[in-house]
Amino acid sequence: MNTLVQLKAGQLAGIQRLDLSCGLTEFPREIFELADSLEILNLSGNALSSLPDDLHRLPHLRVLFCSDNAFTELPACLGQCAKLSMIGFKANRIRHVPAAALPPLLRWLILTDNCISQLPDELGERPLLQKLMLAGNHLAHLPPSLANCHNLELIRIASNRLTGLPDWLLALPSLTWLAYAGNPVEMAADVAADDATPDIPWSALELAEVLGEGASGVIRKALWQPSAKPVAVKLYKGSITSDGSPLHEMQACIAAGLHPNLIKVEGRVVGHPDDQAALVMDLIEPSYRNLAALPSLASCTRDIYEPATRFSLAVALRMARGIASVGAHLHRHGITHGDLYGHNILWNAAGDCLLGDFGAASFHATADTVETRALQRIEVRAFGVLLGELLQRIDVGLSDTTRQILEGLQARCCQPEVLARPGFEEVEALLQSIPQH
């Protein structure tokens, strides 16, 4: 984090990224002295409600973060920034998004947790748009012009007021990761699964160290008494995340049920002193690790893999089969995961894998309707992306014939005609038919 003192003293000349979070109520004009080099400007966590009309005087500005401020309108000056491609205004009080605020190279727009009820039609005139984060607003519909955004891969529209998912949305050729929980359109969760989940008293848990923390909650190690069984406890936060509501995530975890490639839910915590929602889950063996890291600002919708990550055909096939199997399982239960990515998969050296993080999960009808099929085939594209990433990293055992089969499957999963893609059951059957040597 940089300081205002450094900025005003001229000590930041030549920097490409500036991070200022110090209670700012107005944009420091000294930022313009960095115009020759500044590419990423992070002004999140201040008290700003406007930006200067001449923001375009930062000609190299590519990324602007202004989350957790006091904006009521997306500033129109953004549209004049020729190179600006990523805009983040999460958790403001934005009600109005003028068309003038949309820069021509817009690729990634974050408007999570605001008060937006309408988006401009001109949003569909941004052909590079790839990632659109709109969870936690007041949207009852989306601009039909978004049908023109053929590069749009990730949409978060959870916790809005949508009564239907438009046909054009489900036909977008590149759409891969969709989250729409907490809208009137979403099917009700499987109450039977919810009822069958045991209640575990808070008093029966001895909490230990923190194992991890994400946007939706904190995971802690614990001992479950009276048997002192080691478990993991996920304590859910109440606020809206980029994916949607943490409580919807909890509901999806319960409804997902049992599968070898899911982390088992032991029960729901009751009697927390602050009434905090929590689940008790199996403790994962330390031999498991994340398959990939989150996308970067540059990669946008693609995970980052360690350069040294390599697999044998047997290990890659075992992971691909596991994820296809759990995908089919979830779809049979009327659940789309919404965030099927390497960074949400834990794996070990044998190729055993677990799909986690249900923050973007949504419920759909289990009947075989065109809408259900489209929702499921959108997720199959995510599997196709993952399969391609695994294929790139196989270093042992891959014959030309097997490569052709896997590349053919990957192409079918990612083809632009959504309903022509295979379902997960067909994908799983094909993967099972491939010899491992």
Residue ranges of predicted features:
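Activation segment signature within eukaryotic-like protein kinase domains
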Residues: 319-320
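Catalytic-loop of the protein kinase fold
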Residues: 327, 331-347
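Short beta-strand micro-motifs within the conserved protein kinase catalytic domain, predominantly
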Residues: 264-277
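The feature captures the LRR N-terminal capping module
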Residues: 1-53, 57-112, 118-121, 131, ...
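Conserved protein kinase catalytic/activation segment
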Residues: 344-356
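Structural motif at the C-terminus of the N-lobe alphaC helix and the adjacent alphaC-beta4 loop
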Residues: 251-260
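ATP-binding glycine-rich loop module of kinase domains
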Residues: 216-252
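C-lobe/activation-segment region of protein kinase-like
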Residues: 354, 359-410
